[in-house]
Amino acid sequence: MKIIGIGNAIVDVICKVEDNFITANNLTKSTMKLVDESEFKKLLSNLKIEETISGGSVANSIVGLSQLGNKVGFIGKVNEDNLGNKYEEGLKKENVNYFYSKKKEELPTGTCLILITPNSERTMCTFLGTAGKINENDVDVSAVKNSEITFLEGYLWDKGDPKKAFEKAIKNSNKVAMSLSDLFCVKRHKPHFLDLVKNKLNITFANEQEILSLINTKNFNEVISFGKQLGKLIVITRGEKGSIAIHKNEIVECDIQKNLKVVDLTGAGDLFAA
């Protein structure tokens, strides 16, 4: 298998909102906030659902890789409930090998409320549910060892058990790629993420804000120097400034495609990683 992903198995619930909904609910635009089930339901109670689809950061990337013709797999925990069944069906429909056997869990399948504002930005409120209970016993070691690359998400560090799954996957992987996931996620786990990037990852994906925060700088030239010294591949998205890939002394920059109508930025970074 080319690539296996391990991440939070989340069902995305997409709703359109005005900017004042974000501020009124003390949310920070364009970021992800962890919420409990009651807060999730409270937020959703005043909204109209536009779409419900299988999601999760790494899962989105894995689906993208499948659509590009790669043989891929995914490990993520869902409950044996209606949403969990739909999640598995969604992955299989996209030709993703799903290496997890559902069973009845105490918590429901994880859900993410994705709030789309008029400028097409997305703000996420995630109730991890069963997804946040993934542990080392859920990692299919054979599937990991038989994959060229294991792709992980920084969000796995937000709970205790998933960290063990993360570490087991790294131990058994041929090559490891990781997305830093979110600016606040980087801030929560900065020392751990910096150690991972320097010592354990082969490929790192980040946006400009995340990588600046990780190395404690406001100067992007310092990011370039860091990338050169790192000696491993680091790929950074920079919004309107395009993207850049750094590997030792080799730097490749890509401009954005202009005059596109942006409808929804949900999963944009995930598909870029694919």
Question: Where are the language model's segments positioned?
Answer:
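Glycine-rich phosphate/adenosyl-contacting loop at the front of the ribokinase-like
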Residues: 1-75, 85, 262
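Cofactor-binding loop segments of dinucleotide-utilizing enzymes, especially the Rossmann-like FAD-
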Residues: 6-8, 77-80, 103, 116-118, ...
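Hydrophobic beta-strand scaffold residues
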Residues: 72, 98, 176-177, 234
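A glycine-rich helix N-cap at a beta->alpha junction
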Residues: 90-107
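Conserved phosphate-binding/catalytic loop of the ribokinase/pfkB sugar-kinase fold
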Residues: 99-104, 114-160
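Conserved beta-alpha-beta core of the PfkB/ribokinase-like small-molecule kinase fold
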Residues: 149-224, 232, 241-243
